[in-house]
Amino acid sequence: MPASSGQQASAIEAKGFPNLPRVHWTERYFRLVWGAVGIVGCLLLWQLGSSTGVFDPLFVSSPLEVLRTAVLLLPSPEFLGHLFITSQCLFLGLSIALVVGVLVGLPIGWFPRLNATFEPVIAAVYGVPYIAFLPVIIMWTGIGMTSRVIIVFWSALFPLIINSIQGARGVDDNFLRVGRSFSATNFQMFLTITLPSSVPYILAGLRTSIGRAIVGVVVAEFFMSSKGLGYFINLKANALEMAPAFVAIVLLALFGIALVSLVTYIENRFCNW
């Protein structure tokens, strides 16, 4: 006698899906320690190059000089204003890119006709350097906060779209067959199977997008702003005041490390399936 739906559900629940091995806390600690070793090693090499004259002090400040300058610069209201403008622009553009990238990419990956229609368009646009769109964006929106957010958004968008497409296309067929066996609609399977299965792909795309977004905000502030860390770096570098410029560069690097570490933590904490 064939098993009822309730019995099938109980059997599946009792058996469970195979679990992927979790990342043990010792492995995370190992990665953290060696990551710190890598950063410290780079700083030591930087200081050694500055001390031995390999790096011209006119163009490359030493880490110690950058640290001394940072202690004086960070409490400055003017510098904090630049930092706030860049942070605001970066997080706005990146957040909008995340939402739009997922909302566009998942349906394209889920529906074969949409995939066949839009995949060549995405590949063509993605192949164009996003800096090439800078004059067009300036013509459309002028020079201001809106144009800078659009540059950050455009810089970060396509890795999220592409990874969302791959996530939707890479769903295990066994999961879909289980959903169909319980008469789940396409929309229900999309919400309960495709979307959760795509989260690791989306987070991988977000890690790539973070670096592109930071580059985008700096380039936008180079050409389209009188505020922000990008403007500050350009201003100080043109005046050959390299220590303050390197303070801003290090802060941007710390932004990237912090955001990527946050995404990695979320992935390790919630995506171990």
Write out the residue ranges for each language-model feature.
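Periplasmic/extracellular loop-to-transmembrane helix junction in inner-membrane transport proteins
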Residues: 16-28, 51-96
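Generic hydrophobic transmembrane alpha-helix motif, especially the helices
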Residues: 123-159, 166-167
